Amino acid sequence: MKEIKVIIAGPRGRMGHEAVLLMERTEHFNLVAAVDYKHGGEKISDLPGMPALHAPIYADLHTCLDEVEADVLLDLTTPEVGKQHVTLAVERGLRSVIGTTGFTEEELTRLTENAKEKAVGTIIAPNFAIGAVLMMKFSQMAAKYFQDVEVIELHHDQKLDAPSGTAVKTVELIRQNRESKQQGHPNEVEQLAGARGANVDGIHIHSVRLPGLIAHQEVMFGGDGQMLTVRHDSFNRASFMSGVKLSIETVMNLDHLVYGLENIID
């Protein structure tokens, strides 16, 4: 396979560290630079626990793109920084794979239009774990037969956004096979604000943040005399790397934006 030159934004995070290791062990991936505002001017190998890769680190993406030739930006930063980075990547005509979440429908619409206009491949993935993508697809299938559903997502206590992008994407897929319906008793009253969780078109999402967790989600369907639960668990961040690898390889052949890995797997 042809070499793919990659820039990683956010190499010091746990996902970023796993992605650097992915670069090291994948023959056709070449890590040409990284972006980290705290370590501009250093090299990847200077960071604690990193392999002996000598890709330069830039403090900002603008400077990096001015000085480095790359095929793909892999962004594993924070929601706000990720939004800035993907916008800049599209403007510069650079393919990108975005692992941050928190995009609004309006932001996705604007990015989709811009990527189409520039004919630049872009993948935004709420979750890179293949099992999580299948969990979302199975939930979408089940919604055709079970109209009563709630989502419980559980993540580590350092996660910045709630609900998770995976939960929001799951609900979006379920809505495609489910008529709008308010879940629960029509006259129910919350004795404490937020007791029933977030409400998206009548579907409740409950967010848990605790140390010891990584990324987990249950989609619970209820029917007459039965329950169906679709669950996925990521026990470490290595679980996301197969999806990262697939996304980097796939985005090379795209000329538009794709939201969600379910749209690129068979």
UniProtKB/Swiss-Prot annotation:
NADP(+) binds at K38. One of its GO terms (cellular component) is cytosol. NAD(+) binds at G10, P11, R12, G13, R14, M15, G99, T100, T101, A125, P126, N127, F128. It comes from the Bacteria. It is found in: Cytoplasm. One of its GO terms (molecular function) is 4-hydroxy-tetrahydrodipicolinate reductase. Its EC number is 1.17.1.8. This is 4-hydroxy-tetrahydrodipicolinate reductase. The lineage of its organism: Bacteria, Bacillati, Bacillota, Bacilli, Bacillales.
